[in-house]
C-alpha cells in the first residue's frame, strides 16, 4: 500500500491568492500610472480590464481622480475618452472637478467642464467647487466657475452657513469678493455664528477688502450687524488693533461706534483691554464716550489700568478726569473657579459670583414674615454693595438703583445704552455673567474661559457653561503646539469647578491714586497669587506694562485658524505636498451663550497651519492688499 503523501500539485488556493495579489499590484500600478501620466501603461491595463476605470482606492478615488491629483491633462482626456465617469464622488463627496478646483488647476477645470463635469455637486461639507475656488489666488478659476453658476449656487451656504462670499473674505481675496458681488452675491447673509462677510473682512485687516463690501449697495446696512456674542465690526477692529479700519467704518453714517456686546462693552473697552493705543486714540477722536460702564461697572480706563497698558491709560485719563474710573470689584473674600492659565484675564472680564451670599439671603428672606420688607431691602442693599461697589450706600433705604440690561431683540434697540430701573422688593435679581471673550494681548488671542451663569431660584442652580458653536469651537481646537503644557491646562474648558484658589486682586482706592502710582512707577495693585502653574501678575516697575506675566508661566499656545480646511484630501498620500492651505487666523471671539458644550462637537476643522503665519502674528491678519 502506498504511503499517503501530500499533493503539492493542487494549487488552487495558491493560485487564488496569487491572483488577488496580482490584482492589487495592477490597481497600484494603475493609480501610479494615472498620477504620473504614463499613458501607454495605463492604456494597456485598461484595455485588458475596462472595469478598472471605476475601481476606487481606500479613499474612494478613481484613476481619473489620481490623474487630476497629478495634474495630468492628457491622462484626464484619455480616461474620459475610454469611458471614465466624470462625476464620481470620493469618500469625502468630492468630484474630479472639485478636486481640480481645490488644487487650483485651471487647465484641468476647463477640460472637465468641457467634458460635462457638473459644478453643482456639493461635498459632504456642503461646499461646491465655487467655495473651493475662493482659496485660489488666481481669480480666473473663480471666473470660469461663475460663468457656469446660477444665483442660487453663488449664494449657496455650506454646513457652516458660509457662502463663497464668506470664504472669499475669510481668505482675504479682494478680487474674488468683487467678482462675487458683481455676479449677485448677497452680503447680508450670515453664517452659523451670525457673521457676515464684512465681519470676516474686518478680521482680515484688509482695508481694500472692507471698502469693496461697504461700497456695495447693501454694504452700509450690515455695518451694525452683531455676531452671536454681540460684537459688531467696530468691536472686532478695535480688539484687533486696526485703527485705520475703524476710521473707514466711521465714515459710514449708519455706523454705531458705541455699540454694546453681550457684556455691554463698547469698542473702546476692547481697545483699552487689548492695549491698542492707536484704536483708543481713534475712538476718542471720533467722539467716543470714555465713561461708559460695562456689566461689571468698569470703564475702559479701569481695564487699561488693570492690564497695565500705560499708553492707553494716558489717553483715557485725559478724557475721563471729570468722572474717575472705579477699579474692578475686589475678589479677595470669595473663592474663584479654577480657570487654568486664563484666571488672570477672567478677573478682568468675569463678574464675581456671590452665590453663597445670595443663597443665604434667600433663606433669610423666606424665613422672615412678609411684613419685614424694610429689613429685606437692607439685606439686598448690603449684598449688592458687596458685589458691585460702595456707590449705592448713599441710596435711600427703601430702594436701590440697579442696571437692567434689556435683551437686544431688534436692530434699533440692541445698541441702546442700559436703562436705570428701581429694584422691586423681590430679592436680588440674578447677576448675568458671561464667559471670557478672548482679547488680543501681547500678540496672542487668548482663548476664553467659561463663566458660570448665576440663577436666582430657590437653590443656587448648577453652573451652565457657555456653549460654543461648532465653528467657534474649532477656532480653539486646531492648535499647532498641543503639547508642552501642564496636564491641568490642556483643556481649561473641562476644569474641575470645585477646585478653587485664593487670589488677591485690586485694593479699593481712588482712580487718581491709581494713576499717580502708575505714572510714578509704584505698584498699582497687589500681586496675584495662585497655584504654581498659574500665571502671576508682578508689580510693574516704572514704564513697564502689567501685561507681562511671570517668565515661568506656561507658553501660550498659538491660536489655530477657525475654519475647516478647504484641502480636499488632507491625509491622502498622492496629494502630499499639494493640499490647499487656508492661511489666515481670525481674531476669534467665541460664543458666550449659556449652553452646555458638547464634547463631541470639539471636532477639528482641518489640519492647516494658522493663517497668522502670513499675517505677522497670531492676533491679527495682515493687510495683504494695503
From Swiss-Prot:
Keywords in alphabetical order: ANK repeat, Phosphoprotein, Repeat
InterPro entries in the cross-refs: Ankyrin_rpt (IPR002110), Ankyrin_rpt-contain_sf (IPR036770)
Residues recorded with modification Phosphoserine: 474
Region entry Disordered, spans: 354-377, 455-491, 522-626
Compositionally biased spans, kind Polar residues: 616-626
Extent of the ANK repeats: 25-54, 59-88, 92-124, 125-156, 160-189, 193-222, 229-259, 263-292, 296-325
Amino acid composition bias (Basic and acidic residues), ranges on this chain: 354-372, 604-614
Keyword Repeat included in the entry's annotation: yes
Keyword hit for Coiled coil: no
PANTHER family assigned: ANKYRIN REPEAT AND PROTEIN KINASE DOMAIN-CONTAINING PROTEIN (PTHR24198), ANKYRIN REPEAT DOMAIN 55 (PTHR24198:SF188)
Protein name, UniProt field: Ankyrin repeat domain-containing protein 55
Amino acid at each position: 500500500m502506498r504511503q499517503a503523501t501530500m499533493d503539492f500539485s493542487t494549487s488552487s488556493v495558491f493560485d487564488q491568492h496569487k491572483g488577488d495579489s496580482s490584482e492589487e499590484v495592477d490597481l497600484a500600478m494603475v493609480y501610479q500610472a494615472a498620477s504620473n501620466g504614463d499613458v501607454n501603461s495605463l492604456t494597456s491595463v485598461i484595455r485588458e480590464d475596462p472595469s478598472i476605470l471605476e475601481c476606487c482606492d481606500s479613499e474612494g478615488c478613481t484613476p481619473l481622480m489620481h490623474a487630476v491629483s497629478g495634474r495630468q491633462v492628457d491622462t484626464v482626456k484619455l480616461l474620459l475618452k475610454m469611458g471614465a465617469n466624470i462625476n464620481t464622488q470620493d469618500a469625502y463627496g468630492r468630484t474630479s472637478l472639485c478636486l481640480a478646483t481645490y488644487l487650483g488647476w485651471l487647465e484641468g477645470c476647463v477640460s472637465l467642464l468641457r467634458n460635462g463635469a457638473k459644478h453643482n455637486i456639493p461635498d459632504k461639507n456642503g461646499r461646491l467647487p465655487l467655495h473651493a475656488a475662493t482659496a485660489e489666488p488666481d481669480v480666473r478659476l473663480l471666473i470660469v466657475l461663475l460663468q457656469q453658476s446660477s444665483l442660487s449656487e453663488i449664494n449657496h451656504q455650506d454646513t457652516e452657513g458660509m457662502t463663497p462670499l464668506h470664504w472669499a473674505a475669510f481668505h482675504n481675496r479682494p478680487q474674488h469678493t468683487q467678482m462675487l458681488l458683481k455676479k449677485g452675491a448677497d452680503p447680508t447673509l450670515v453664517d452659523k455664528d451670525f457673521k457676515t462677510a464684512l465681519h470676516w473682512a474686518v478680521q482680515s485687516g484688509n482695508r481694500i477688502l472692507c471698502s469693496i463690501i461697504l461700497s456695495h449697495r447693501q454694504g452700509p446696512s450690515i455695518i451694525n450687524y452683531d455676531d452671536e456674542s454681540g460684537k459688531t465690526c467696530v468691536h472686532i477692529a478695535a480688539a484687533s488693533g486696526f485703527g485705520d479700519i475703524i476710521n473707514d467704518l466711521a465714515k459710514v453714517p449708519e455706523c454705531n461706534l458705541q455699540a454694546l456686546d453681550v457684556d455691554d462693552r463698547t469698542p473702546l473697552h476692547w481697545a483699552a483691554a487689548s492695549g491698542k493705543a492707536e484704536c483708543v486714540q481713534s475712538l476718542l477722536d471720533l467722539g467716543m464716550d470714555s465713561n461708559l460702564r460695562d456689566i461689571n461697572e468698569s470703564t475702559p480706563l479701569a481695564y487699561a489700568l488693570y492690564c497695565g497698558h500705560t499708553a492707553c491709560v494716558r489717553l483715557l485719563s485725559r478724557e475721563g478726569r471729570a468722572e474717575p474710573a472705579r477699579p474692578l470689584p475686589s475678589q479677595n473674600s470669595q473663592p474663584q473657579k479654577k480657570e487654568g492659565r486664563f484666571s488672570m484675564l477672567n478677573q478682568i472680564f468675569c463678574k464675581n459670583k456671590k452665590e453663597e451670599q445670595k443663597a443665604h439671603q434667600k433663606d433669610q428672606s423666606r424665613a422672615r414674615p412678609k411684613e419685614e420688607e424694610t429689613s429685606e431691602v437692607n439685606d439686598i442693599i448690603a449684598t449688592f454693595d458687596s458685589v458691585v461697589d460702595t456707590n449705592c450706600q448713599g441710596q435711600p433705604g427703601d430702594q436701590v438703583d440697579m442696571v437692567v440690561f434689556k435683551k437686544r431683540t431688534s436692530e434699533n434697540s440692541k445698541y441702546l445704552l442700559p436703562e436705570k430701573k428701581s429694584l422691586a422688593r423681590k430679592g436680588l435679581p440674578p447677576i448675568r455673567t458671561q464667559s471670557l471673550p478672548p482679547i488680543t494681548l501681547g500678540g496672542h488671542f487668548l482663548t476664553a474661559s467659561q463663566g458660570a451663569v448665576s440663577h436666582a431660584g430657590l437653590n443656587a442652580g448648577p453652573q451652565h457653561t457657555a456653549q460654543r458653536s461648532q465653528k467657534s469651537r474649532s477656532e480653539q481646537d486646531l492648535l499647532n503646539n498641543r503639547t508642552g503644557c501642564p496636564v491641568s491646562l490642556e483643556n481649561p474648558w473641562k476644569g474641575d469647578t470645585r477646585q478653587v484658589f485664593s487670589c488677591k486682586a485690586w485694593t479699593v482706592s481712588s482712580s487718581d491714586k491709581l494713576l499717580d502710582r502708575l505714572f510714578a512707577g509704584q505698584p498699582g495693585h497687589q500681586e496675584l497669587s495662585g497655584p504654581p502653574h498659574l500665571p502671576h501678575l508682578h508689580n510693574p516697575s516704572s514704564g513697564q506694562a502689567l501685561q507681562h506675566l511671570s517668565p515661568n508661566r506656561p507658553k501660550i499656545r498659538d491660536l489655530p485658524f477657525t475654519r475647516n480646511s478647504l484641502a480636499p484630501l488632507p491625509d491622502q498620500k498622492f496629494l502630499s505636498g499639494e493640499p490647499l492651505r487656508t492661511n489666515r487666523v481670525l481674531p476669534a471671539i467665541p460664543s458666550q451663550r449659556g449652553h452646555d458644550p458638547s464634547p463631541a462637537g470639539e471636532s477639528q476643522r482641518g489640519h492647516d497651519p494658522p493663517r497668522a503665519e502670513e499675517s505677522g502674528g497670531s492676533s491679527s491678519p495682515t493687510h495683504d492688499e494695503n
